[in-house]
């Protein structure tokens, strides 16, 4: 979602691609919806086939070049993934329409990088745009919570199907013929030096399905192989994005829920606090301790540390109004991380969150706009808010990719 906002901010609001923006605006909203839906379905299908097979559509001198049959197979990834994404966005859309808000149909953002041999999922997601402000905390709550809960339900149903219809090991051996000689014990032999292989993390939903739903445990793929299984990979990504959207920060869906339940005063304290903790975790373990007397890499480490400080500062530069306060916060974060790195060198966060934190701090913001009608929520909505918190815990993975 944050990447989408970056895309919108750069290409639309800042007019860096003004002619393209005007061309898109001239298309009717319904035609634009179906056009971008079709393009994004194609790009996610291309990406899905690449993940399933471990090959690309272009000859880069190694591996097999994909063909037409692989494209049709890629639909096993794209259709459920785009389907869940659509359910999520229309959850927002229908509740916005219910409250007579001026809202756009979902806009899908295609992004396929296989032509340069980079892995991608074929899309940067989708978003709706509210052209008018919602009037009450209740409206913000209903619009905010509808998307992730709808998407979560779709993801769970997809994963139930995926885990109850796992293919035999021959499916994986067709992707990696070199594993076949090890049989069901392949994981004990082929990951001694995993190198640049991508490993999916875990979450409580996956743990539940693996431990209590799958009857033949030998069919459960290793974390390094999950992306070859389109239903599992699409479901994992759906849970990942659901968790991101439910972070109780700024104007993410979770931020709307936090604001709706507790009001602006609590949100203005809790949201920036959680954001700072998020940035702290993302860059935990990054500072490079320096021995000024004996360190042979003194210059490199100094530059690395200055770079880390710069990234943290850019991320938190809108927490306070005064730049000096943000600089003090930055140095405090870095200083504590530095001390922890000295005394607990194995303690690390997840650097993959850094870009997300940058986009959240710089483009979406961590505060929430006010509303005209500031009354609290009903007991039923409070219960749904607690349910959304449970959903967040079930979906969240501290290290989603490794």
Language-model features, listed with the residues they occupy:
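Hydrophobic transmembrane alpha-helices and their immediate loop junctions
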Residues: 1-402
């Amino acid at each position: 979602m944050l990447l989408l906002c970056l895309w919108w901010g750069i290409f639309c609001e800042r007019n860096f691609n003004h002619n393209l923006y005007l061309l898109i605006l001239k298309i009717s909203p319904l035609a634009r919806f179906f056009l971008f839906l079709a393009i994004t379905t194609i790009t996610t299908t291309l990406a899905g086939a690449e993940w399933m097979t471990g090959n690309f559509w272009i000859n880069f001198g190694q591996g097999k070049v994909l063909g037409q049959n692989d494209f049709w197979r890629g639909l096993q990834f794209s259709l459920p993934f785009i389907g869940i994404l659509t359910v999520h966005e229309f959850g927002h859309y229908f509740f916005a329409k219910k409250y007579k808000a001026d809202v756009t149909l979902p806009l899908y953002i295609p992004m396929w990088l296989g032509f340069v041999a980079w892995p991608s999922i074929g899309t940067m997601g989708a978003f709706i745009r509210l052209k008018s402000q919602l009037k009450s905390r209740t409206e913000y709550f209903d619009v905010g919570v509808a998307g992730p809960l709808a998407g979560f339900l779709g993801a769970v149903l997809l994963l139930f199907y995926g885990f109850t219809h796992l293919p035999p090991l021959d499916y994986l051996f067709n992707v990696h013929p070199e594993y076949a000689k090890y049989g069901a014990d392949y994981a004990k032999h082929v990951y001694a030096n995993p190198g640049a292989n991508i490993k999916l993390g875990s979450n409580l939903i996956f743990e539940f399905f693996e431990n209590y739903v799958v009857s033949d445990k030998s069919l459960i793929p290793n974390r390094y192989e999950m992306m070859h299984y389109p239903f599992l990979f699409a479901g994992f990504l759906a849970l990942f994005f659901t968790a991101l959207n439910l972070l109780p920060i700024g104007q993410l869906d979770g931020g709307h829920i936090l604001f709706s339940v507790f009001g602006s005063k609590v949100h203005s304290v809790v949201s920036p606090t959680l954001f700072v903790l998020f940035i702290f975790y993302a860059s935990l373990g990054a500072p490079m301790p320096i021995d000024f007397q004996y360190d042979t890499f003194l210059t490199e480490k100094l530059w690395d540390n200055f770079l880390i400080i710069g990234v943290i500062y850019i991320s938190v530069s809108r927490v306070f109004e005064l730049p000096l306060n943000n600089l003090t916060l930055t140095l405090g974060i870095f200083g504590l991380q530095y001390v922890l790195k000295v005394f607990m060198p194995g303690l690390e966060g997840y650097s993959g969150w850094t870009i997300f934190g940058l986009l959240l701090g710089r483009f979406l913001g961590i505060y929430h706009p006010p509303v005209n009608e500031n009354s609290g929520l009903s007991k039923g909505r409070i219960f749904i808010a607690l349910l959304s918190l449970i959903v967040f815990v079930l979906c969240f993975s501290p290290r989603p990719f490794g």
